[in-house]
């Protein structure tokens, strides 16, 4: 999966939030067992897409009556899953957000590619982490996302 992601720690729920960033979502269909989801039809996005709201970093399809493309994609692909290994991952990424020494970007990419998805699918524990994968969504973001830690997962 090639995507530019924003990582933010939600300290209230002790979970890590991952979301796409940039002028527009650049999600592509995923190869392999997850398959691909075709882009959402333009009619799924209402004319009044809620740009007046103070929500930051959400694509305009987030205000669709049928829900955002990402949510539809992840629901279809069962990607709202549990986290098993490295319970300190949210704290590690939060340290990177603060500019403190932690995992390197390369280590993070390897972690996501080689560990996380397998563990989410095959194992499971109580701590929950929602991941929204923009599979084919081409809707522009309402406004620029808040500053946070970026990395590219190749």
From Swiss-Prot:
Predominant cellular place of this UniProt entry's protein: host cell
Any one Gene Ontology cellular component term annotated for this protein: host cell mitochondrion
Changes after translation: A fraction may be phosphorylated in insect cells and HepG2 cells, a human hepatoblastoma cell line. Phosphorylated in vitro by host protein kinase C or mitogen-activated protein kinase. N-acetylated in insect cells.
Region Mitochondrial targeting sequence, annotated ranges: 68-117
GO biological process terms held by the UniProt record: DNA-templated transcription; symbiont-mediated activation of host NF-kappaB cascade; symbiont-mediated arrest of host cell cycle during G2/M transition; viral genome replication
Cross-referenced InterPro entries: Transactivation_prot_X
Location relative to the cell: Host cytoplasm; Host nucleus; Host mitochondrion
Keyword annotations of the record: Activation of host NF-kappa-B by virus, Activator, Apoptosis, Host cytoplasm, Host G2/M cell cycle arrest by virus, Host mitochondrion, Host nucleus, Host-virus interaction, Modulation of host cell cycle by virus, Transcription, Transcription regulation
Family statement: Belongs to the orthohepadnavirus protein X family.
HAMAP family per record: HBV_X
Complex formation: May form homodimer. May interact with host CEBPA, CFLAR, CREB1, DDB1, E4F1, HBXIP, HSPD1/HSP60, NFKBIA, POLR2E and SMAD4. Interacts with host SMC5-SMC6 complex and induces its degradation. Interacts with host TRPC4AP; leading to prevent ubiquitination of TRPC4AP. Interacts with host PLSCR1; this interaction promotes ubiquitination and degradation of HBx and impairs HBx-mediated cell proliferation.
Task performed by this protein: Multifunctional protein that plays a role in silencing host antiviral defenses and promoting viral transcription. Does not seem to be essential for HBV infection. May be directly involved in development of cirrhosis and liver cancer (hepatocellular carcinoma). Most of cytosolic activities involve modulation of cytosolic calcium. The effect on apoptosis is controversial depending on the cell types in which the studies have been conducted. May induce apoptosis by localizing in mitochondria and causing loss of mitochondrial membrane potential.
Protein name, UniProt field: Protein X
Organism lineage: Viruses, Riboviria, Pararnavirae, Artverviricota, Revtraviricetes
């Amino acid at each position: 999966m090639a995507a530019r992601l924003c990582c933010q720690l939600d300290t209230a729920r002790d979970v890590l939030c991952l979301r796409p960033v940039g002028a527009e979502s650049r999600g592509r269909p995923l190869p392999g067992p997850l398959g691909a989801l075709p882009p959402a039809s333009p009619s799924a996005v209402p004319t009044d897409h809620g740009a007046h709201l103070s929500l930051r970093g959400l694509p305009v399809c987030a205000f669709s009556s049928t829900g955002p493309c990402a949510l539809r994609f992840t629901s279809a692909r069962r990607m709202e899953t549990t986290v098993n290994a490295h319970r300190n991952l949210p704290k590690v990424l939060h340290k990177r957000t603060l500019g403190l020494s932690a995992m390197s970007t390369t280590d993070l990419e390897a972690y996501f590619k080689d560990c996380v998805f397998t563990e989410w699918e095959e194992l499971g524990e109580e701590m929950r982490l929602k991941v929204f994968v923009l599979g084919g969504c081409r809707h522009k973001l309402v406004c620029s996302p808040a500053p946070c830690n970026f990395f590219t997962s190749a």
